[in-house]
A protein has these predicted regions:
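Acidic/polar, compositionally biased interaction segments
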Residues: 17-201
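Bacterial N-terminal signal peptides
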Residues: 2-12
């Protein structure tokens, strides 16, 4: 069972894609969706606005959940399938400036997502203990399975960063999740989404 920080999180996570139970052999990477021109430092400034229901200003595939200095007054959603190398209990850690929320699914879909870590305001880069809810409770993850992971990040002004780390079997202290454990979820990239039929001339 995933621990839920629903009272601390925005609790308005919307799906970037439907996801599939059997992810097959997805491509490595993380989908980064960016919305620009949004003031405020709270995640709710992004998720509670109508703009979050519209197409992102920009969509990229990045190699990791470790980014910095993308600009001011923007919001971001990062989507990936997480696959651990060894079965066991893992903790996930979140660091960001400004605020962020870390959500994890029970499988490769977004059907049962839980908010497992948060940053309110900001934390120092790669500091996993500035705030009490930056680290998740231990979560049992099985090798070979995919788990849908989402980070919602909101930046107002000044320096900005967002990172996700893990600890677990043979990983005694937090390290940035390696790119070898992150994969692009099917259906998230714009070219993967169904397009309306072209109108006849």
């Amino acid at each position: 069972i995933l621990p839920i920080l629903s009272l601390l999180c925005g609790a308005m996570l919307t799906e970037a894609a439907s996801g599939v139970s059997d992810a097959g052999d997805p491509s490595p990477g993380v989908v980064q969706e960016l919305w620009f021109g949004i003031p405020g430092a709270s995640v709710k400034d992004l998720t509670h606005g109508k703009i979050f229901d519209t197409a992102a200003s920009a969509v990229h595939t990045v190699s990791s959940l470790d980014v910095e200095n993308l600009g001011d007054q923007y919001g971001a959603r990062y989507s990936a399938l997480l696959r651990v190398p060894v079965s066991g209990k893992y903790r996930l850690y979140l660091s960001s400036d400004d605020s962020a929320e870390l959500w994890l699914g029970k499988d490769a879909t977004q059907k049962d997502m839980a908010c497992i870590a948060t940053v309110k305001g900001y934390s120092d880069p790669h500091n996993w203990s500035n705030q009490p809810n930056q680290a998740s409770e231990p979560v049992q993850l099985e090798a070979g399975r995919f788990y849908f992971l989402v980070v919602i990040h909101k930046e107002d002004g000044g320096p900005d960063h967002m990172s996700v780390a893990w600890s677990g079997p043979d990983i005694p202290s937090p390290v940035i999740i390696p790119s070898t454990a992150l994969f692009v979820p099917p259906g998230v990239l714009p070219e993967d989404k169904p397009q309306p039929p072209a109108e006849a001339d």
